[in-house]
Amino acid sequence: GCNIEFDNYSNTIHAEEAAISAFISAGEKNPLCIAVFTFGDKATFPCGMCLQSLFELGGKNLKIIACNKNTCESKTISELLPMGFNL
């Protein structure tokens, strides 16, 4: 997925949201890993809202890999969102 930014910033679609939508639309379930990339100076992990959505889709052991042009860092979603929940 990719970020889609609008003038009304609350309508912006995060790359993770777009990736989740494509994943589900393709009939997939239970992802093992998701990678995010930025051209910035620091590898950046998903925001809290996206982490919660990823937690609900992939569970507490989902691996998140954050990369920039120089490095990659890997964490489980439980490390990034220790209080993730399912209803």
Could you tell me what each predicted segment is?
Residues 2-17:
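Compact, glycine-rich, soluble single-domain proteins
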Residues 19-20, 51:
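Short, well-ordered amphipathic alpha-helices
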